[in-house]
Regions:
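FabD-like malonyl-/acyl-CoA
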Residues: 1-146, 200, 277-311
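Alpha/beta catalytic cores of group-transfer enzymes, especially the acyltransferase/condensing modules
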Residues: 10-13, 39, 84, 104-259
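NAD(P)-dependent dehydrogenase/reductase Rossmann-like domain
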Residues: 181-183, 221, 274, 306-307, ...
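A short, acidic, amphipathic alpha-helical segment used as a generic capping/interface helix at domain edges
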Residues: 258-275
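Non-catalytic positions within long, well-ordered alpha-helices that form the structural scaffold/packing
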Residues: 77, 190, 271-274
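Conserved functional loop/turn residues at catalytic and ligand-binding sites
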Residues: 94, 226, 274
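Short, solvent-exposed amphipathic alpha-helical segments in soluble enzyme
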Residues: 23, 151-153, 190-192, 288, ...
Length: 317
């Protein structure tokens, strides 16, 4: 009866997240202090006080979400919980993979925060504002969504990029690329029978080929930090397999910038490898909700508040 810990991605941020963890657990507060020191600014003040529009900027949201996830984990550990002894696998959605890797000892908390700040800035700068877009497609088979993307790319100027960026499961796919191509693909998906095709309010076309400049920046950034083999298997977004090779993990993180987040397959992999319980560690309950739709046999829980820390400790022993 294995347990998996998962770490949320962008979109789960909210002003005030993690504050009660920091108030209840000195070890959790220390995580926020470590990240403030690493970034040379009071990110914790922004997390707890806002404004929301500044917190939502990708260069802030990415390290902020990791801070809350690692604070929740440190709170568990402060009460005697052992990640290595109690958890079989970890994974994270997009930026959450960095949280999972920091939790597993692949990189230090400080380096992970700096990597995510670099990643957020690089992804934001890769495409001029207004030229990229993303859309959520609900209730359409993946093959039909991919066909719509291919048709839209061919029908747009200069063979514009359009691709599936996130396979979230539960009938939800996210497409990403050039604005004109994504808008056309969303229209085509509706014509093919999608229940909804919703343009997303995002600042850049994440997880698309247009992020190639950001991928190169991350290749250099990852080469410049100390890396260790994780103490617990981390299931990769890009390959849906764990590896203990630090260089291979770094390669997969570079590929992740332009590649698909294969979250549905990740949850399916958990089920196939004996996971009976999945916890979402950090802000929100997006991943636990997705997991319930993907595999109803996996029980879910969340660890993002002081009360949830206590509940998880009682359940996990």
């Amino acid at each position: 009866m294995a347990v998996a810990f998962t770490f949320p991605g962008q979109g789960s941020q909210a002003v005030g997240m993690g504050k009660d963890l920091a108030d209840a657990f000195p070890e959790a507060r220390r995580v926020f202090e470590e990240i403030d020191e690493a970034l040379g600014e009071k990110l914790s003040k922004l997390i707890w006080e806002g404004p929301e529009e500044t917190l939502t900027l990708t260069a802030n949201a990415q390290p902020a979400l990791m801070a809350v996830s690692l604070a929740a984990l440190r709170a568990l550990e402060a009460r005697g919980f052992s990640l290595r002894d109690k958890v079989s696998y970890v994974a994270g959605h997009s930026l959450g993979e960095y949280s999972a890797l920091a939790a597993s000892g692949f990189v230090s908390v400080a380096d992970a925060a700096r990597l995510l700040r670099t990643r957020g800035n690089a992804m934001q700068a890769a495409v001029p504002p207004g030229e990229g877009a993303m859309a959520a497609i609900i209730g359409l088979e993946q093959a039909d969504v991919e066909a719509a993307c291919a048709e839209a790319a061919q029908g747009s100027a200069n063979g514009a990029v359009c691709q599936v960026a996130n396979d979230n499961g539960g009938g939800q796919l996210v497409i990403s690329g050039a604005k004109s191509a994504v808008e056309l693909a969303a229209k085509l998906c509706t014509e093919k029978g999608a229940k909804r095709a919703l343009m997303l309010q995002v600042s850049a076309p994440f997880h698309s080929a247009l992020m190639a400049p950001a991928a190169e920046i991350m290749r250099e950034a990852l080469a410049g930090v100390a890396k260790k083999a994780p103490v617990i298997p981390v299931v990769s977004n890009i390959s849906v397999t764990p590896t203990s090779d630090p260089d291979e993990i770094a390669r997969r993180l570079v590929q992740q910038v332009t590649g698909r987040v294969r979250w549905r397959e990740t949850v399916e992999w958990f089920g196939q490898n004996g996971v009976s319980t999945l916890y979402e560690v950090g802000a929100g309950k997006v991943l636990s909700g997705l997991a319930r739709r993907i595999n109803r046999d996996i029980a879910t829980g969340a660890v993002g508040t002081a009360a949830e820390v206590e509940a998880a400790l009682a359940a996990l022993g």
